Regions:
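Class II aminoacyl-tRNA synthetase catalytic cores and aaRS-like
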Residues: 1-477
Length: 477
């Protein structure tokens, strides 16, 4: 099989001939080795982990993976090679010649001259077995090891590529990247679900608080981006956010990543929605182009049919309905909801999923929410009798709410009244100052990055698209 006798003769002829002085082997990633156009015996060094070992009478076959690609590199060695520690999961360094493969399953293979086991792995104790496909739920028990499986490797490569694609979208669109703080004295969402930051021993700090004011882990970088939007017309941030929500649902984490943007000199939600839709489609297209094998594995193994669902989302223009229209659609539905839809009440997950299905499983923007439902910074539409603000949520298949955004209230007196009614005037005097000194119409949005990955990959549980999930009663590692 695979021309084993020919390979054996080649290996032995190499070992029996006088050993010439070789130049040092070039270190190559598995991805680069597999993509080599000229596999003409170049001496290379590949490092990685063994995914499979197969011993024949005269030839030993290994598959080595270093995380750079889904596909592994086939290594061919003389069967006399000491293979006692070559097991699934062991780490190796292989030096040899990169040659064209005789197999139709791969273009190139590595003809080994030297195999060094860097770290052994006892397959009896290793929680994952060769050729087994453990469930994502099972893998969550091993946050320190699950990245070594094919499916988690693919998810994390997609995550990496999506991160790069999002940065590229904003850079190409002229946005300035801002590092917003992790520790803050602001509660942007006003929900009170914050993690407070304190030193381990308050007695070591003479003041009442370490920072002289209560400090928290950020729930959003929006307010800091609004500061920056007074000097830069387009800004964005991409970083961790924290919510002390007592939830173990498939859609919530205590620590997750948010993509947030603020744009100055815009006066309509349409302008904002255009950027949101562009970001969604641009990043998805980049991921499909840069790691198609990884996306295909997730779709095939975890979400059959997701490929077609994603293509459907990308080729259609996103729809737009008002909050009022959404409530009317829900009230006319034959489905029995746990939460009765009524004007003035928030939309729940069951409502969001129904609306997406009603719209043909195309992402849909819901605009103009009741003023009473939204935070103080959203722009008053001055409408009646149903008083609304210029807010927008993007609902997507399988997830529900993915984006949330609004035009910001740039008018000083409107904002002053909203803050006064909420008892926040003193705490947000600095925010009012932004409206006193060169205020402009502006708006922004936030996108939950993990939910975005769930949407494009079709993964049901948010805990499976982040390397180290943190949620109620769980902070492993």
């Amino acid at each position: 099989m695979f021309g084993a006798r020919c390979l054996l003769r080649a290996l032995r002829s190499c070992s029996s001939a006088p050993c010439p002085r070789h130049k040092p082997s070039a270190k190559l990633s598995v991805r680069d080795a597999l993509g080599a156009q000229n596999a003409s015996g170049e001496r290379v060094k590949v490092q990685g982990w063994v995914r499979s070992v197969r011993s024949q009478k005269e030839v030993l076959f290994l598959h080595v993976n270093d995380g750079s690609s889904l596909e592994s590199l086939q290594v061919v060695a003389d069967s006399n090679c000491d293979s006692r520690e070559l097991a699934f999961g062991s780490s190796v360094e292989v030096q040899g010649q990169l040659v064209k493969s005789l197999s139709k399953k791969q273009n190139v293979e590595l003809k080994a001259e030297k195999i060094e086991v860097v770290g052994s792995c006892d397959p009896k104790d290793f929680p994952f077995k060769y050729k087994e496909r453990p469930t994502l739920e099972y893998l969550r028990q091993f946050p320190h090891l699950r990245c070594r499986t094919n499916v988690l490797g693919s998810i994390l490569r997609v995550r990496s590529e999506a991160t790069a694609a999002i940065h590229s979208f904003f850079k190409d669109s002229g946005f300035v990247h801002i590092h917003t703080p992790i520790i803050t004295s602001n509660d942007c969402e006003g929900a009170g679900e914050l993690f407070q930051v304190e030193p381990p021993s308050k007695g070591k700090v003479p003041e009442e608080n370490f920072f002289d004011v209560p400090a928290f882990l950020t729930v959003s970088g929006q307010l800091h981006l609004e500061v920056m939007s007074g000097a830069f017309t387009q800004v964005f941030t991409f970083g961790p956010t924290f919510r002390a929500e007592n939830s173990q649902s498939r859609r919530h984490l205590a620590e997750f990543y948010m993509v947030e943007a603020e744009i100055s000199f815009i006066e309509s939600l349409q302008d904002l929605m255009q950027v949101m839709e562009g970001l969604f489609k641009s990043a998805a297209a980049a991921v499909l182009s840069s790691c198609p094998e990884d996306v295909a594995l997730c779709h095939r193994v975890l979400a059959p049919g997701q490929k077609d669902r994603l293509e459907h989302m990308l080729k259609n223009n996103f729809l737009i309905i008002s909050y009022t229209e959404a409530v009317e659609i829900l009230q006319q539905a034959s489905q029995n909801f746990t939460f009765t839809p009524e004007w003035g009440a928030d939309l729940h997950t069951e409502h969001e999923k129904y609306l997406v299905k009603h719209c043909g499983n195309i992402p849909v923007f819901v605009v103009n929410y009741p003023l009473a439902l939204k935070p103080f910074y959203m722009r008053d539409n001055e409408d009646g009798p149903q008083h609304t603000v210029a807010a927008v949520d993007l609902l997507v298949p399988g997830v529900g709410e993915l984006f949330g955004g609004s035009l910001r209230e740039e008018r000083y007196h409107f904002l002053e009244q909203r803050l006064a009614r909420s008892g926040l005037t003193e705490a947000y005097q600095w925010y009012l100052d932004l409206r006193r000194f060169g205020s402009v119409p502006h708006g922004g949005f936030g996108m939950g990055f993990e939910r975005y990955l769930q949407c494009i990959l079709g993964i049901d549980n948010i805990k499976d698209v982040i390397p180290f999930p943190r949620f109620t009663h769980s902070c492993l590692l």
